[in-house]
Amino acid sequence: MQGETSLSFPAGHPVFAGHFPGQPIVPGVLLLDAAVHAVQQALESGAGAATTCQVQSAKFLSPVAPGEILHLSWSDSGTGQIRFGIAGPGRQVATGVLGFGSPA
C-alpha cells in the first residue's frame, strides 16, 4: 500500500495562537496527526477494519509556516510498518515510521 495527499494548516488555526505568538510554526504533533489520519483512512478503505497506531519513529527536519502547502506520502514496508515523509517547497519537513495493528 502507498499513497499521497496534500496538507495545509491555515493561519487562522487555533494552535498558532500559542505556537508561537508573533512567529507561528506548525507543531510536530499536528504533522504526526495528519500522517496517522491519512494512513488510517487508507487502511480502513482497503481492509475495512479499525486499527491501532504506534509512532515508532519521527524526525522533524524543518519548520513549517502557517498556510504552507505540504506533500505527505507513505508506503508499506511489507512488515506492518508504514514509512511516511512530509515535504514542503524544496525541502523535507518530516519523516517517520508508523506501526499499525488490530485493536485489542
Residues covered by each model-derived region:
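A broadly conserved detector of short glycine/acidic/proline-rich loop/turn motifs that flank catalytic sites
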Residues: F9-H13, V64, D76
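A generic structural signal for short beta-strands and their flanking turns/coil linkers
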Residues: G3, F16, A49-Q56, E68-L70, ...
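HotDog/MaoC-like acyl-thioester-processing domains
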Residues: M1, A65-P66, S75-A104
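Hydrophobic residues in beta-strands and at strand termini
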Residues: L7-F9, F60, F100
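Hydrophobic beta-strand-centered segment that forms part of the acyl-chain substrate-binding groove
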Residues: V36-S73
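Catalytic strand-loop segment that frames the active site of acyl-thioester-processing enzymes
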Residues: M1-V26, E44
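Residue-level signal for inorganic ion chemistry
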Residues: G28, W74
